[in-house]
UniProtKB/Swiss-Prot annotation:
Pfam families: Prenyltransf. This is Ditrans,polycis-undecaprenyl-diphosphate synthase ((2E,6E)-farnesyl-diphosphate specific). Keywords: Cell shape, Cell wall biogenesis/degradation, Magnesium, Metal-binding, Peptidoglycan synthesis, Transferase. It is an enzyme of class 2 (transferase). GO terms for molecular function: ditrans,polycis-undecaprenyl-diphosphate synthase [(2E,6E)-farnesyl-diphosphate specific] activity; magnesium ion binding. The lineage of its organism: Bacteria, Pseudomonadati, Pseudomonadota, Gammaproteobacteria, Lysobacterales. Its cofactor is Mg(2+). It comes from the Bacteria. It comes from Xylella fastidiosa (strain Temecula1 / ATCC 700964).
Length: 255
């Protein structure tokens, strides 16, 4: 089954995107190193994967490392890189066994070559899995995403493969990250911060936003269910009127 033809249950999001925020502050409030928070954050991410598999949610996109995170203290960045390599060594096989496809979006060329090799191996190993598509945004920024898409189209115009008047939203969208997936139905951010922080700026134009004060290391199935209950109570309009939504019937929303 092609991913864009998955039937839509209007009370259950197909695709959830999450900013996993609050690891460092969670640790600092407990007088622990920020690295302790990041370790706990990995466990929260795995709990979230478990929840999506249990509920039948087909796509999960996690903001793991932003393009701005390179400006954090060097020891914290180095720890995150080392932890990522260890995670790929232990966790990817388990994700593969459970039918999870792993993808990475972002500027991976900035990472150490060993980490890039782990990313590539993880993608190849899990490429045929369809139970859950897990996209990890690493060294990613929404503005960067749009810039790269615009640059690709500009190169096509310069090469004579494309006319400027042929460029529209659909064509630009085809060059964005996650272009082969439906846009996120629901966006979640933890830690009480109410910002989207340069995450999936293009992709979340009509996404339902949900914020919680819970720090990411404490994020669990109870909080996720609260988010889903809230989502189920909302009416997604996509710019339409109540009458237009009613005439379309349940489940007929843009892919």
């Amino acid at each position: 089954m092609q991913i864009n033809t998955i039937p839509v249950n209007p009370t259950l999001p197909r695709h959830i995107a999450i900013i996993m925020d609050g690891n460092g502050r969670w640790a600092e409030r407990r007088s622990r190193p920020r690295t302790t928070g990041h370790r706990a954050g990995v466990k929260a991410a795995m709990r979230t994967v478990d929840f999506c598999l249990e509920k039948g949610i087909k796509m999960l996109t996690l903001f793991a490392f932003s393009s701005e995170n390179w400006n954090r203290p060097a020891d914290e960045v180095n720890f995150l890189m080392e932890m990522s390599i260890k995670l790929f060594g232990r966790g990817i096989e388990e994700l593969h066994r459970r039918g999870v496809q792993v993808r990475f979006i972002g500027e991976r060329k900035r990472f150490d070559i060993a980490l890039v090799e782990h990313m590539t191996k993880a993608e190849h190993l899990t490429a045929s899995n369809q139970r859950l598509i897990l996209s990890l945004a690493v060294s990613y920024g929404g503005r960067q995403d749009i810039t790269m898409a615009a640059r690709a189209l500009a190169q096509d115009v310069a090469a004579g493969r494309l006319k400027p008047e042929q460029i529209d939203e659909d064509l630009l969208g085809q060059h964005m990250a996650l272009a082969d997936l439906p846009p996120p139905d629901m966006f979640i951010r933890t830690s009480g911060v109410i910002r989207i922080s340069n995450f999936l700026l293009w992709q979340i134009a009509y996404t339902e936003l949900w914020f919680t004060d819970v720090m990411w290391p404490e994020f669990n199935s109870t909080v996720l269910q609260q988010a889903l209950d809230d989502y189920a109570s909302r009416e997604r309009r996509f710019g339409l009127t109540n009458a237009q939504i009613a005439s379309r019937g349940k489940g007929s929303i843009p892919a």
